């Protein structure tokens, strides 16, 4: 029985669907805080690969975990060589926020989160990992 399970596992591991599942993953930042001048949060996503990727589970969250994302300019698919942005415009000053998105496949997807002032100045930033 053990040999059958191992055999099926190896068979699945070689399948494109399984490989795609393994390559899917969340990209997330740690919390950033722009201080008292913080007005909005921008989360940038860029597909540096040669094929389109699927995007899901997008969020910009505060300390309480609630998703404050209110402007999704990414959609569900990001073509190769293209970037997009997620915004949260109703954020509290001095509260930390993070950004997360699941990309499939995620190997060539990069991103960053920025805390900005009302004038658009970057107050804090961090890469998504």
Task: Give the residues covered by each predicted segment.
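Gly/Pro-rich, tryptophan- and cysteine-flecked surface segments typical
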Residues: 18-129
């Amino acid at each position: 029985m053990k040999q059958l399970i191992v055999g099926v596992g190896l068979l699945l591991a070689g399948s494109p669907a399984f490989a795609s599942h393994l390559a899917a993953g969340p990209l997330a930042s740690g919390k950033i805080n722009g201080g008292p001048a913080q007005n909005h949060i921008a989360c940038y996503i860029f597909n540096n690969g040669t094929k389109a990727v699927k995007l899901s589970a997008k969020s910009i969250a505060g300390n309480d975990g609630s998703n404050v994302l209110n402007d999704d300019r990414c959609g569900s698919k990001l073509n190769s060589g293209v970037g997009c942005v997620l915004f949260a415009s109703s954020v509290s000053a001095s509260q930390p926020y993070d950004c997360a998105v699941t990309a499939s496949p995620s190997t060539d997807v990069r991103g960053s989160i920025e805390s900005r002032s009302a004038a658009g100045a970057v107050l804090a930033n961090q890469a998504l990992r």
